[in-house]
């Protein structure tokens, strides 16, 4: 059996910029929170089909703390980066062992990378309508 191609793993904005600076052809992005399953891999395969052999697929893996409300368990959200990167490489490796796209880039930042000044606080005051709709 042929070996699996390894995606380019980036963890910071400069690393991502460097990876994309030389990335070939058209690009497609698939945004995820990780813990990839077949549905994610199908989206990545479709992205690869659309950009073709000379394009670049970027997969983001970011568990965004802003997506969790107070009382929801951010810490319980699975973190499976190593397995996710392996699954992506497996999914986009052709029968000859070559990557089926020009480049596969994984961007897996930490919250500190995404929010260098700390998490932004957004407050929305919907006014009196909120009391009616609650």
Task: Enumerate the predicted regions with their spans.
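Nucleotidyltransferase catalytic core that binds NTPs
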Residues: 2-134
